[in-house]
């Protein structure tokens, strides 16, 4: 059964390559026994690339989580979120984004998550965009009976009004 989704709200102040940000996220993933995971993060990143339409950034965020499993178990966790992001416009209508995130748990040594995303965006015309997005997740301490790794591929076409 695959029933998963993410809603995320981000706010950032950007100045001279520095990005100070706060975000809130809601995640649910029935296949991984997550009914709801709410998180709030505060941190910064720095883009070392000075080329327009390119990004090579490192970031650190401090994150608080509240997770509710399908069997109604509630856990609270504090995590560090270390990010490495690359973004490059290959052609006028093609952009590639690579993102890696390492999320260790402060309270439990050896408990960490890893998330890698590869996103290819192709602008078909002024209104349509094709997006091919692959996501790999690793959780060192998943719920019992849940595999440590998870992979999904999402293809979408969006229309801009």
For each feature predicted by the language model, list its residue ranges.
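Transmembrane beta-barrel strands of outer-membrane/channel proteins
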Residues: 22-26, 42, 58-64, 98-102, ...
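Residues that define the transmembrane beta-barrel architecture of outer-membrane proteins
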Residues: 1-5, 36-40, 54, 74-80, ...
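Outer-membrane beta-barrel "beta-signal"
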Residues: 122-123, 149-161
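Residue-level signature of outer-membrane beta-barrel architecture
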Residues: 11-13, 26, 46-48, 86-88, ...
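Repeated loop/turn-to-beta-strand initiation elements of outer-membrane beta-barrel proteins
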Residues: 17-21, 52-56, 89-96, 122-132
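Membrane-embedded beta-strands of outer-membrane beta-barrel proteins
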Residues: 7-9, 42, 82-84, 116-118, ...
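Gram-negative outer-membrane beta-barrel proteins
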Residues: 19, 28-34, 50-52, 66-70, ...
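Surface-exposed extracellular loop regions of Gram-negative outer-membrane beta-barrel proteins
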Residues: 3-25, 94-97, 102
């Amino acid at each position: 059964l695959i029933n998963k989704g993410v809603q995320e709200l981000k706010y950032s102040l950007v100045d001279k390559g520095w990005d100070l940000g706060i975000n809130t996220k809601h995640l649910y993933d029935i296949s991984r026994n997550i009914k709801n995971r709410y998180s709030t993060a505060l941190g910064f990143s720095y883009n070392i690339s000075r080329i327009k339409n390119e990004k090579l950034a490192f970031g650190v965020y401090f994150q608080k989580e509240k997770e509710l499993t399908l069997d109604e178990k509630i856990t609270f966790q504090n995590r560090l979120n270390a990010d490495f992001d690359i973004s490059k416009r290959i052609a006028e209508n093609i952009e590639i984004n690579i993102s890696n995130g390492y999320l260790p748990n402060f309270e439990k040594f050896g408990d960490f998550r890893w998330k890698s995303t590869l996103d290819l965006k192709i602008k078909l015309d002024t209104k349509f965009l094709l997006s091919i997005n692959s996501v790999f997740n690793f959780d060192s301490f998943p719920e019992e009976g849940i595999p440590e790794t998870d992979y999904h591929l999402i293809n979408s076409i969006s229309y801009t009004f």
